[in-house]
Amino acid sequence: LNNDDKSEKLGVGKSGDQTYKIDKLAENAIIDVIKDNIPDCYIISEEAGNLGKESNEITVLIDPIDGSTNAIHNIPIFSSTILIAKGRRFNEIISTGVYDLNTDEIFLSSENKIPTLNEKQINVSSTETLDSAIISINPRALNNLKKNSNISHLLNEIRYPRCFGSAALEIAYVANGRLDGFIDTTNTLR
């Protein structure tokens, strides 16, 4: 897609966020693959909302493009995410995946299995102190600085605070030690 095509606004998705053409194209491709491989599932997607029979035991939660703003502005930090669970409460996670569309990296985690990056085991960072930590923060959490002095204090203690704009990818980076932590105080992640 060229820049104009991918940034074309298509309306507001079921999650309440702006839906761009790149979001919808990614969503359609992901849903097609899911329907081919898990035909009897219930899909919850950021753009389309709920698809399938509610009586289906397996639920698949997808965010076709996590970091849409980055994607439409050619900032190469965005991903596609999928979570597969039994039931609707997400307390029995079967598997999760984050696909970095720019590096072709696939972060996977399954029930009772070691998390992997491109099929190789990953581990969290060994950093133990904030003064040497690289911690990412949801940029919307910065709006809470005036309301929450703890966040301000924490940011002053962190050696390298970062804001990347793709929460799923940032959490995957924590899982493999690229980041030492991720902070979100907004309670808006889905």
For each of these PLM feature ranges, what is it?
Residues 1-65:
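N-terminal subdomain of lithium-sensitive/metallo-dependent phosphomonoesterases centered on the IMPase/IPPase/PAP
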Residues 23, 34, 68, 100, ...:
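Residue-level signal for inorganic ion chemistry
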Residues 28-32, 81, 172-175:
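Predominant activation on well-ordered alpha-helical scaffold segments within soluble catalytic domains
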Residues 36, 123-190:
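An extended, acidic
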Residues 42-46, 62, 71, 162-165, ...:
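General beta-strand structural signal in soluble alpha/beta enzymes
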Residues 54-112:
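DPxDG-like acidic metal-binding loop motif
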